[in-house]
Amino acid sequence: MANGHSFKHVSYLWDDEKAAALHGDEVGLLVYRSNLLGADLRLTNYGGGNTSCKVKAVDPISANEVEVMWVKGSGGDLGTMKRSGLAALYVERLRSLVSVYRGKAFEDEMVQLFNHCIYDLDSKAPSIDTPLHAFLPFKHIDHLHPDAAIAIAASKDGEAITRELFKGSVGWVPWQRPGFDLGLQLKKCLDENPGIRGIMLGSHGLFTWGNTAYESYVNTLEVIETCAEFVEQMKEANGLEFGGEKLAALPEADRRRQAYTLAPVLRGLCSSQQPMIGHFSDDARVRQFVNSQDLERLAPMGTSCPDHFLRTKISPLMLDLAPDADLSNAEEVQEKIAPSFKAYREMYAAYYEGCKHENSPPMRDPNPVVILYPGVGMFSFAKDKQTARVAAEFYTNAINVMRGAEAISAYTSLPRQEAFDIEYWLLEEAKLQRMPKPKPLSGKVALVTGSGGGIGKAIAKKFASEGACVVLNDVNGDRLRAAEQEFSLQFGCDSVRAIEMDVTDSSSVIRALEEASLAFGGIDIVVNNAGISISKSIGDHTEDDWDRLYDILAKGQFLVSQAAIAVMRKQGMGGDIINIVSKNAFVAGPNNAAYGSAKAAQAHLSRLMAAELGPDKIRVNMVNPDAVISDSNIWSGGWAEGRAKAYGITVEELPAYYAKRTLLNESILPEDIANACFAFVGGLLQKSTGNTLNVDGGVAAAFLR
């Protein structure tokens, strides 16, 4: 029981104290209400739905009191929206656009006219749903895509069920593409049914309202609760969902094994036009659907709600693989599933050719977004991790809709032409064209060893800032977790994973690459940066010193590269391996026998790898730093003391000494090494392999000959 309201299927999150602090600020209450609604993915999807409020304001030119509508702007998300995510428009001007409306065939031209109705010039651009709110008189309005409501809206008998369930208190508007005309249809429905508390949109979603932010919030929850309770009762009455289980899901550990083994193969196939990032989901809802008797009937039908198929494509690809299939031979697996991808691309091309108009945009990437693996789970692939994850969330919503619709009646998807007209809508294309240009490393996954701090963290940060998903790893768990938190705050949780890894332990390395494949679908860039330094004379070196240096530097580089190469070969997309070596690989000096020779081993191993991996389009290059003076582990383990002793100076004098001995008289920072690594992978040196880039300020003895 919440404030007198009892809800079983939705979350009542309203906090009277927080709302009281916003008393008198209707726009602030709109943002608050929107965030509450967007926090529950059962109510609306990420980026989906919109809310509004109408308030009195003073016109800055006439000084007259006018009615202004604040509504979620284009491209926003209710759960995270702030005041800056709202558009503010004159209500009277919006409604007056009816006088210049030329009919449904011309409704797209109305969008440009919204700009002539803007009240706050600093507000967000209006969305296509703006007139849907403007033509309704209510002060506060919510438009959501709740799974339970869409289950009714997408069922064969949706209109009759709506009228019976709500006894006429919720209206019905048949499916129609969002836009100016749909706003007029909502007004017509309300005019014909005065006193209703909401309107169900066929195959789309729900409109509800109230005179205050709180009234609208509660009304919205109550209508959705009624839908959800009805759907649940019908599920219980009808027994088996999705026709019952066709096959049993593998145990969780086995599902994960199949997923991380298969993901790089799928990623390679999905990336035939541009590199894609993967996501894997195997929650109970997904498992029930992919393991069901009705999967083969329902999945090809596609989704109903526009927000769903805009994110997931017209339908998913279903893999014809046994849950426990042997996936160890990537070539055989690819040979088996490649025909399914070919058939999917042909299906998508036929869909495009059969539905396109003279002015339709060119066909987009024909590869699937959602891939269903019976017995295992669901993969999704998109241009970045967030988009891939959200696509999975949207398809899970679609599963919920299909489950509910099948329980109460029969699920119906949108006709192909209607779906196409949404997907290739010129307004949708214009929105895509306005999106920022992809960064150089967008769609790439980079693993940087020793990235809890120092050079490794700087490299990972540079890659993340250029659009890559990054896998941080370090043997120091505390340092790694601190780096993960820092990266998550700066770049978002989706684009970073932190995995503890010991580069000297093959099982630890393999496990890290498996986790990376599960998280992102595979790997594109590996930077072997993990290292230590020990400075002693030959006489003072111990066998343990020698073994430790060679294990971490030479063996570690080999083990990580070997595991990464296996993943890259599965993908068939090439790749980059960058080895952080050292000036000391090429320059002899005192008290440096073990470290310098281990670095030399790294350097020659790099050349050998480059010679071998060329046919796989895997490039191997080296960056040779020297005397990185900031936040580097090179100063631990007695290295600084050893080098200072060798040069006859104090530790405090080392930075200046190192800078002065360079030709450029410059100190070297971790960011300098990061920039050098980016130079190899940023797109300008795609035909370079086996090369060495010195980042040492200019040390003549280290010039390569």
Model-inferred region functions:
Residues 2-446, 458:
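Glycine-rich flexible loops
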Residues 689-705:
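Short C-terminal tail/terminal secondary-structure segment
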